[in-house]
Every structure is written in structure tokens, then in C-alpha cells.
Amino acid sequence: MKISKQDVEHLAHLARLAVDGSQVESLTAQVSNILDYMDVLKEVDVDGVPLASGAALGTNVFRQDQVKPSPGPCVTLANAPERDDDFYTVPRIVG
């Protein structure tokens, strides 16, 4: 499956990743290779292969709640794309 440079740039923008021109070409090739391999995996015959076991198949698996100290606003807001003092700034979505 082919992916365009514009697709990679759009994905980087959505993920808020800074990608320069030299990286776009490399990422475009890498993502295309990954998507091509996914197409190959779709064709694999898995009839007769038992389902995986373990945590992935667990239903209603709960753990006990444990109170842990908060890391504080400096840590939690460190990667926020936009902030105002100790608050996240998000786009307005209501009229």
C-alpha cells in the first residue's frame, strides 16, 4: 500500500511530531513497508491455529485500586502542547 508524503506530514501533524523534510521521505518508505507487510499478514492461513492465551483473552480482569501520590502539575503538564499556568489549553468544541 502506498502512502504519500502528504499523508506522513498529516499524521505527524496530528501526533504533534516535528518532522523535517529529510525525515519525511524515510518515514514515507517505512510506513509503506509496514502497510505492505500488513497486507501480507492478511493473507496468512490461520485455520487450525489455537487462540492465544494469557492476559489478552482475560475478561473482567481487575486489580485492586491503590492510592499513589500525584506527580504534580510540572510533570503532568510537561508534554502539553498548550497550557495556561497549571491548566491544559484545549480547542473550544462547544458553540
UniProtKB/Swiss-Prot annotation:
Its EC number is 6.3.5.-. Keywords: ATP-binding, Ligase, Nucleotide-binding, Protein biosynthesis. The keyword Protein biosynthesis applies. One of its GO terms (molecular function) is ATP binding. GO terms for biological process: regulation of translational fidelity; translation. It catalyses: L-glutamyl-tRNA(Gln) + L-glutamine + ATP + H2O = L-glutaminyl-tRNA(Gln) + L-glutamate + ADP + phosphate + H(+); L-aspartyl-tRNA(Asn) + L-glutamine + ATP + H2O = L-asparaginyl-tRNA(Asn) + L-glutamate + ADP + phosphate + 2 H(+). The keyword Lipoprotein does not apply. Belongs to the GatC family. Allows the formation of correctly charged Asn-tRNA(Asn) or Gln-tRNA(Gln) through the transamidation of misacylated Asp-tRNA(Asn) or Glu-tRNA(Gln) in organisms which lack either or both of asparaginyl-tRNA or glutaminyl-tRNA synthetases. The reaction takes place in the presence of glutamine and ATP through an activated phospho-Asp-tRNA(Asn) or phospho-Glu-tRNA(Gln). Heterotrimer of A, B and C subunits. This is Aspartyl/glutamyl-tRNA(Asn/Gln) amidotransferase subunit C. It comes from Desulforapulum autotrophicum (strain ATCC 43914 / DSM 3382 / VKM B-1955 / HRM2) (Desulfobacterium autotrophicum).
